[in-house]
Swiss-Prot record:
<dbReference type="InterPro" id="IPR036320">
    <property type="entry name" value="Glycosyl_Trfase_fam3_N_dom_sf"/>
</dbReference>
<dbReference type="Pfam" id="PF00591">
    <property type="entry name" value="Glycos_transf_3"/>
</dbReference>
<dbReference type="InterPro" id="IPR008145">
    <property type="entry name" value="GK/Ca_channel_bsu"/>
</dbReference>
<dbReference type="GO" id="GO:0033863">
    <property type="term" value="F:ribose 1,5-bisphosphate phosphokinase activity"/>
</dbReference>
<dbReference type="InterPro" id="IPR017459">
    <property type="entry name" value="Glycosyl_Trfase_fam3_N_dom"/>
</dbReference>
<comment type="pathway">
    <text>Metabolic intermediate biosynthesis; 5-phospho-alpha-D-ribose 1-diphosphate biosynthesis; 5-phospho-alpha-D-ribose 1-diphosphate from D-ribose 5-phosphate (route II): step 3/3.</text>
</comment>
<dbReference type="InterPro" id="IPR036566">
    <property type="entry name" value="PYNP-like_C_sf"/>
</dbReference>
<dbReference type="Pfam" id="PF07831">
    <property type="entry name" value="PYNP_C"/>
</dbReference>
<feature type="region of interest" description="Thymidinephosphorylase">
    <location>
        <begin position="194"/>
        <end position="693"/>
    </location>
</feature>
<keyword id="KW-0328">Glycosyltransferase</keyword>
<feature type="binding site">
    <location>
        <begin position="14"/>
        <end position="21"/>
    </location>
    <ligand>
        <name>ATP</name>
    </ligand>
</feature>
<keyword id="KW-0019">Alkylphosphonate uptake</keyword>
<dbReference type="InterPro" id="IPR017872">
    <property type="entry name" value="Pyrmidine_PPase_CS"/>
</dbReference>
<comment type="similarity">
    <text>In the N-terminal section; belongs to the ribose 1,5-bisphosphokinase family.</text>
</comment>
<feature type="region of interest" description="Ribose 1,5-bisphosphokinase">
    <location>
        <begin position="1"/>
        <end position="193"/>
    </location>
</feature>
<dbReference type="GO" id="GO:0006206">
    <property type="term" value="P:pyrimidine nucleobase metabolic process"/>
</dbReference>
<dbReference type="InterPro" id="IPR027417">
    <property type="entry name" value="P-loop_NTPase"/>
</dbReference>
Amino acid sequence: MSVMGSGLFFFVVGPSGSGKDTLIEGAKAALGPTGRYVFARRAITRPADAGGEAHEALSVDQFDAVLAQGGFLIHWEAHGLKYGLRATLLDDMAAGRHVIANGSRAMVAALAERVPHLVVVEITAPEAVLAERLKGRGREGAENIAARLERKVPPFPESVTVIQVPNDSTPRAGIEKFVAALVAQTARLRLVRMAIETGRRNVAFLARGNTVVAAPDYLGPGRVDLIGEGRSIRAEVALVGDALLPSDAVGLSSEAFGALGLPEGAELVLTRTPVPESRAALRRKIQGATLDEGAYAQVVGDIVEGRYPDSEVAGFLVAADRSLSDDEVLALAKVRAKFASRITWDEPMVVDKHSMGGIPGSRITMIVVPIVAAHGLAIPKTSSRAITSAAGTADAMETLARVDLDSAEVRRTVERARGCIAWNGRLSHSALDDVMNAITRPLGLDSTRWSVASILSKKLAAGSTHVVIDLPFGARARVKGAGEAHEMARLFEQVGAGLGLTVEAIPTDGSAPIGRGIGPALEVRDVLWVLEDHSEAPPDLKEKALFFASRILAWDPAVGPDRARARAEELLASGAARAALERIVEAQGRWSEPVRPARLTHTVTAQNDGQVSDIDGFAVAGIARLAGAPLDKGAGIDLKARVGDVVRAGDPLFVIHASTAADLEAAAGAALAFDGYGIMMDGKAFRRINPER
């Protein structure tokens, strides 16, 4: 709308109590330093120390003298005082600066004849809010306030551009809206797609000589909002040479352009992202202070809104990694739950099971859920995909059926089958998770206390009432020792109680893989063997699944702790659990053909006689990943020797499965360096386990 050399004149009007002065002062602080806005001082026949707005104090004689010399652009009288705006404001407009002036609605028509590019900004608020503000001033009684609010105002001339800014909330919110309205009229830019990829970061590019905005002013740690056609995106700013972008354009990186979803040439408004109100709280946490729920709500909200650069978020997360009190973990869990999609159930009890993971092959969820569902309790289980392991529960379940369910499909599946095993990426995953994961994973941050808040917030959002948590511990597990596991169990149960959840957290042995298969299809083979009472069913997998299923069934008053184990065994032995898995698979969307273990194989054998004393599950899982798991769901490792088994040189330790010769060769080559097995003979250890572990 505006170009350099032709500024706009913003005439701010509104009833008494609308807060014009506050908004103008706030805008002055935000926009004044740019040098592109002039905030007019009204000349008023009122002493300088009379209070109210900062004005040019003139006597009546002085005012009349300026008027006689043509020094006022416009002038008017109100409440026994004379008001005027200096004619020099026209010079500012001619120089391309935008004028913001506090004015009277009655003078709009006269001003429209004197200035080009007039924009009237009408500040509004409900009568109740106006009355409360006027009462708070203490200048007028109730009768005068009522009379002031009943005054009728003339309509604006049809030829004048009028924008309304509601100021019915906090001063900060009102100032943000006011500034955004001003900038929206002055900073309109054409959208250009830049052939630049910036990864997760949204980047907006401005030519250094941009003629619509002062581009260098937008450099720094702050962000900008780009708004147009009902869509918006938040981005950091980078400058480019004038030859790379038109002077009236804003360029977006490929990722930002796609996220905004508007075509090239669309008109965008550029505004500064408001400074986070929570910055003081964030800095206190970085310095080691304890924050309450309200402070965390502000900090987390501003992080999700993209108001902090990654460096400050990283500082906050490092501080949280070092020190979170029990009360802070509870506060964070409550706050995080608000950023996840909530699911409510018409059920007296909704149960769930979670594992801290890290133990290869421990696919007990696919046995526990069918047992519990066969009993009749609702168990809407959502699980993750593998990040660094050879398979996650979602990867394994996906060999049989769809897992990318939305909340409606989860509800429908549970109604039909009493349970589900779905991927959490479309359900409990939130915008906060995206931000946190992008920063914590490269930095290697893995706070168990932060994890407690995250996990329980998702259970709360999922509508769970009762949750059992598996805490495997061991030298190579995520939780290293029994003491740490028991402390984590205490925290889970305490925070769960604070959220209104019934939580039982149980430390378990995580020193070795569970089951035989490592990789999606091979792990599902083990699951089906257990559910079908196959002679090859891994006993450790069956026992752990029965243990956790019985802990869940014990919550049912009709079963109780004394009968829970027998009930779980009955449901497994009778085939009811196997039938329940079939119902779940059918409800989620069965594949026409399940994924089978890959056909190309390579057997890794023992080099010495002896007894298997140790299996490095992470080393073995690493070989499985080289074979193609988890993306290739048929790839993986089939363990032939378990801890305690006696082997002779040449006996198979495990079999590698792969779908391509190249993957098989890569995995077999890694196994030559270290196969992950420790074998003892006559007290002497023969180890081919990754020495870095």
